[in-house]
Design a protein with these regions (language model features):
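Catalytic loop of the DD-peptidase/beta-lactamase superfamily, centered on the K-T-G motif
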Residues: 1-138
């Protein structure tokens, strides 16, 4: 390696099955199949807002209603305000999205291998999330 490149998600690969296990573990408060993977206290800390109110949120994945915890984006669940409660997850550069909603007791995983939409335009994957919420909560 001539010059190392630091990239938080660069080179991470997973199967859909393992992604489901991961999201299920997070939905269950850090436990999977009876084994404690991450403490509830750590998961709770990761889901607290860590970005100050003075930061412009226009460029966030989910607009001004979005926020950031430690390793997750945070988004108020439908019907909530910016103080929560929140769902949490991540949107990868290649199009993969996962959202865990402990309030409504479900997770959503959207697997794609695209980099931007047509001609490089950013994809609006929030449309998929909105459709899932509308189908489940109506």
């Amino acid at each position: 390696v001539v010059q190392p490149m630091l990239s938080g998600g660069g080179g991470l690969h997973s199967t859909t099955e393992d992604y489901v296990r991961f999201a299920n573990m997070l939905l269950n408060g850090g436990e999977y199949n009876g084994a404690r993977i991450i403490s509830q206290a750590t998961l709770d800390r990761m889901n607290q807002k860590f970005i100050g109110d003075d930061v412009n949120r226009d460029a966030f994945f989910f607009g001004p209603r979005g926020d950031w915890g430690l390793g997750f984006h945070l988004q108020p669940v439908p019907g909530a305000d910016n103080d929560g409660p929140f769902n949490f997850g991540w949107q990868g550069v290649g199009g993969t999205v996962f959202i865990v909603d402990p309030v409504n007791d479900f997770f959503m995983i959207y697997m794609a291998q695209v980099r931007g939409g047509p001609r490089g335009a950013p994809m609006d994957l929030t449309l998929s999330q909105r459709a899932v919420y509308e189908a489940m909560l109506d």
